[in-house]
Amino acid sequence: MKVRASVKRMCDKCRVIRRHGRVMVICANPKHKQRQG
């Protein structure tokens, strides 16, 4: 899980979602998981 000020899709499988007011990226590739913070 990467914590970044700016979350961006890293590939075409990445999905940008909101969970509990946080912007997150979920993907089939675990290396692409990101959270805004």
Swiss-Prot record:
Database matches in Pfam families: Ribosomal_L36 (PF00444)
GO terms (BP aspect): translation
Recorded GO MF terms: structural constituent of ribosome
Keywords: Ribonucleoprotein, Ribosomal protein
Disulfide bridge partners, by residue number: none
GO cellular component assignments: cytoplasm; ribonucleoprotein complex; ribosome
InterPro entries for the chain: Ribosomal_bL36, Ribosomal_bL36_sp
Superkingdom: Bacteria
NCBIfam families: rpmJ_bact
Protein family per UniProt: Belongs to the bacterial ribosomal protein bL36 family.
Protein name as catalogued: Large ribosomal subunit protein bL36
Gene transcribed to yield this protein: rpmJ
